[in-house]
Amino acid sequence: MTERTGKFAGDNPFTIAESWLAEAQESEVNDPNAIALSTVDADGMPNARMVLLKGVEPDAFVFYTNYESAKARELDGAGKAAFVMHWKSLRRQIRVRGHVSREDGDAADAYFASRSLKSRLGAWASKQSRPLSSRAALMAEVAKMTATHGTNPKRPPFWGGFRITPVEIEFWADGDFRLHDRFVWRRETPQSEWHVTRLNP
């Protein structure tokens, strides 16, 4: 493959990402929207964890979390992050690097309202990333939040989304004999024009 044809075709990397994700939703056994999110702490020590991508916007990727969690503190502190989506069923992956901002308005409210009642109550109950004495203590907090918020809990003030606005997106597809296909989209700033380059495997 010498041109960006087939699975790599298109003038918008977000459209390509949406297309690959749609294919993965048909073929991947579990959590096709899982991403390995990488951050760094105040000392520059890297961290990584799996989270679920919840939206591909026209210029950003969106996920939701507890704003008091370790990941949120690191995202707020650095203002930058990276993630990778990898699908064994498709033998493809997407790598993203970019700037981070909060998604803390109507979109966050709407997504929170779409979650199951137990998930919404769990968001209120969990003091994410902090020490927990026992699972029984966690379930007691869930019961307390159930009594407090009933069947229609609003979004907690400490819970919401993050938008990663990329300056780099790489699309990778497996090739025979490890001769993979790689195309990277880069721009200087989120407002700049994209430039596409084929990379060696």
From Swiss-Prot:
It comes from Roseobacter denitrificans (strain ATCC 33942 / OCh 114) (Erythrobacter sp. (strain OCh 114)). The lineage of its organism: Bacteria, Pseudomonadati, Pseudomonadota, Alphaproteobacteria, Rhodobacterales. GO terms for biological process: pyridoxine biosynthetic process. NCBIfam families: pdxH, PRK05679.1. Catalyzes the oxidation of either pyridoxine 5'-phosphate (PNP) or pyridoxamine 5'-phosphate (PMP) into pyridoxal 5'-phosphate (PLP). Its EC number is 1.4.3.5. Its cofactor is FMN. Pfam families: PNP_phzG_C, PNPOx_N. The keyword Flavoprotein applies. It comes from the Bacteria. Substrate binds at K54, Y111, R115, S119, R178, L179, H180. This is Pyridoxine/pyridoxamine 5'-phosphate oxidase. Binds 1 FMN per subunit. It catalyses: pyridoxamine 5'-phosphate + O2 + H2O = pyridoxal 5'-phosphate + H2O2 + NH4(+); pyridoxine 5'-phosphate + O2 = pyridoxal 5'-phosphate + H2O2.
